[in-house]
């Protein structure tokens, strides 16, 4: 009898230790409803001195005709070069574009992340491209698609 009472007490205490934690509160998904946005035909061409880089692409939200965009990033100093500079804001139709370069993965592994905001829909995507994808001004293939997030 003593064994079974001790065993039962152990089992009951163990169940409280392993009980699921209480939820911390509800979270709201910030992902927008609707289709992914596709960045079409993107290329970045920099001048020989790397003081100006011109990005050309189309933003296709899947809800209307694609919006053509020419986005220019300039470097006023010798460093960082335009290909490694932050840029914007710049307007392309209903969209506002900004960008930031990162070298966090080491030399030769840099990448640029664009912020593409639909001002009317209050939605955003963050297309990102490696320096290798953008090298030589070639068009990135295949096109890349991103799920938009809703801005608060």
Language-model segments: which ranges?
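Fungal secretory targeting signals
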Residues: 1-26
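A generic structural signal for short, solvent-exposed coil/turn residues
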Residues: 4, 11, 31, 49, ...
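A broad, structure-centric signal for solvent-exposed, well-ordered loop/edge residues
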Residues: 8, 46-49, 104, 123
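Short, flexible beta-strand-to-coil junctions
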Residues: 17, 60-62, 117-122
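Short, surface-exposed binding/anchoring microloops in extracellular/periplasmic proteins
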Residues: 25-78
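Acidic, low-complexity intrinsically disordered segments
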Residues: 80-152
